[in-house]
Amino acid sequence: MGAVTDDEVIRKRLLIDGDGAGDDRRINLLVKSFLKWCNSGSQEEGQYQRMLSSLSQCEFSMGKTLLVHDMNLREMENYEKIYVDIESSIAAAHEKIAECKKQILQAKRIRKNRQEYDALAKVIQQHPDRHETLKQLEALDKELKQLSHTKENVEDKLELRRKQFHVLLSTIHELQQTLENDDKLAEESQESPMETQNP
C-alpha cells in the first residue's frame, strides 16, 4: 500500500470530529456566558473553567475550519494541475491522431503505388526483355536484307529473260520474213521457166 498523505490524515480526523456544525451556537453561548459572568461579578472557578473550555473548543473548531480551508485550497490547486495535465494530454492525443491519419494516408498511397507497380511489372514480364527483342529485330533485319537481295536478283533475272525473249521474238520475226522471202523467190523462179517454154 502507498504512503498515507497529510491531507488524507486530516480528512479522516475531520470526518471523525464532525464538520463543525453548531460552532455559531457554541460561540453565541460563550459570549452570553462571558457577559453574564462579567455582569454578575461572580468569581466562581467552575464557570470560569467552563468558559475556557468553550473557548478552547471554539479555537479548535476555528483551527479545524482553517485546516479544511487550506486542504480545499490544496485540492483546488491539485485539481487545476490535473486539469492542465488532462488538457495537455488531450492536445497531445489530437496531435498524435492527426499524425496517425497522415501516416495512414501515406501508407495507403504507398500501397496503391506498390499495387500499380506490381501490375505494371506483370505486364512487362509478359513481354520479352530488351536484349531478346533486339536480337529478334536484328534477325528480322538480316532476313529482310536477304529477301531484298533475293528480290533484286529475281528482278535482274526477270529483266534478262525479258530482254532475251524480246531478242528471240525479233529473231523469229526476222527468220519468218526470210522464209517468206525465200518462198517468194522460189515461186518466181519456178514461174520463169514455164513462161520461157510457152512461146
From Swiss-Prot:
The keyword RNA-binding applies. One of its GO terms (cellular component) is THO complex part of transcription export complex. It is found in: Cytoplasm; Nucleus; Nucleus speckle. GO terms for molecular function: RNA binding. The keyword Transferase does not apply. Component of the THO subcomplex, which is composed of thoc1, thoc2, thoc3, thoc5, thoc6 and thoc7. Component of the transcription/export (TREX) complex at least composed of alyref/thoc4, ddx39b, sarnp/cip29, chtop and the THO subcomplex. Belongs to the THOC7 family. This is THO complex subunit 7 homolog. The gene is thoc7.
